[in-house]
């Protein structure tokens, strides 16, 4: 299941639409026309199926962060890329899931941040900063 979180939200939305008959603004579009932006706009308008895409992805990412915290105890998790443009639609489910899955001693400790760097630079600069400290 965790492999789905690496897919884009448009693909996840198409999969949810295929296995559900729940009403959704996304049904007005052909499957090939559904983009991550369309999912985000539908979720912002209160579309429950679109919001469930972010809830699902946030659940998977939060659980993965909880697993990571068990052996690394990070001060923060920094997210970047297009998905983070959804703001609280994705960040709140990530943090909520983390707090449900993590061991008590790590609950509520790390910060969940969105990088202010553009996606192509964020990973390289982050790795460079770690190397600089060594």
Name each model-derived stretch:
Residues 3, 7-134:
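ATP-binding/phosphotransfer module of carbohydrate and carboxylate kinases, centering on a glycine-rich
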């Amino acid at each position: 299941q965790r492999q789905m979180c690496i897919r884009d939200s448009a693909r996840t939305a198409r999969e949810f639409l295929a296995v559900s008959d729940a009403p959704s603004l996304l049904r007005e579009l052909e499957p090939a026309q559904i983009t991550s932006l369309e999912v985000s706009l539908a979720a912002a308008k209160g579309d429950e199926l679109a919001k469930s895409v972010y809830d699902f992805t946030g659940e998977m990412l939060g659980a993965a962060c909880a697993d990571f915290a068990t052996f690394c105890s990070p001060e923060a998790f920094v997210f970047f890329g297009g998905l983070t443009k959804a703001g609280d639609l994705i960040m709140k489910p990530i943090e909520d899931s983390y707090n449900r899955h993590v061991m008590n001693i790590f609950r509520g400790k790390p910060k969940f941040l969105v990088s202010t760097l553009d996606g192509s630079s964020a990973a390289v600069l982050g790795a460079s900063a770690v190397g600089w400290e060594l």
